[in-house]
Amino acid sequence: MPLVEIIHPQDAFDADGKKKLLESLSATCLRWEGIDVNDVTQSIAWVYLDERPRDSISAGGQPLTQNVYKVTVSVMVGFMDYGRIEGMVKEVTDAILAADGTEGTGAARVFVILNEVPSGTWGVDGKVWPSVFTAETVGLEPERVKRMDAAIQSRPRLDVPLA
């Protein structure tokens, strides 16, 4: 159930590039989370293209000489391991460079940050959706859900008493 935000300079993508990113990135991230891509899961996997004026982004304090991208992918904790993260980062980077027309010219301009949201801190329609509940809801196989639950339980949340 990824939420993807791409911060990019104005005019980095033409209309076709934007369309391709909006159509492909939710499916890409769902697949790397191990979630089946279908109409239901696609409806809760959102992509935001956040265009900024070119003069509001710098590299090393200097005006941009090429497009740079900050991609934040937020997922619930428990869905990704290192191999999945690595694959997703590569595929997202490749998709962005293809969309801006510079595929194969180097990816040091694309920073992908995975934000794993702790279980029990993601809300949908006014209700908290813990990772295991979400995994069951989107149809992950029971054995994977069981392993996910064990891993999450081994890293309990730190709740600070308010009183």
Feature roles, as predicted:
Residues M1-A163:
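A domain-level signal for the structural core that forms small-molecule/cofactor-binding pockets
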